[in-house]
Amino acid sequence: MFERKMVSFSVVVPELTCLYLHEHDYDVLAFLREALPDFLSSTLHFISPPMQQAYIGATLVSIAPSMRVIISVGSFVMVPGGEVAALVRADLHDYVQLALRRDLRDRGIFVNVPLLNLIQVCEEPEFLQS
């Protein structure tokens, strides 16, 4: 497993979006805690070869004024900057957007699409890369 480097993704909820969700008494951190493991475990189960292991971990980097969570993923099929990493990043972005909209609608909260579209998911460059 340690032959491959971890791929890190950053989920950023900007200040305006955090304020909007806070006004509606919505806990976006609780949403991410619930939604991210489901997405990552099902995605890694799908892309990892049989009998191979994959690892995930997440760290809350910033909670105010914007919220930022770093997710690290280790799998034999993903490399930093690779095609699979780019696909997982795009799918993660779509999943966070759509799951958040669905959850807000289920709670009867008006979905402000332009504010929710400000949420960003990007692949983080490896900090210790030489």
Swiss-Prot record:
Protein name: Early 4 ORF2 protein
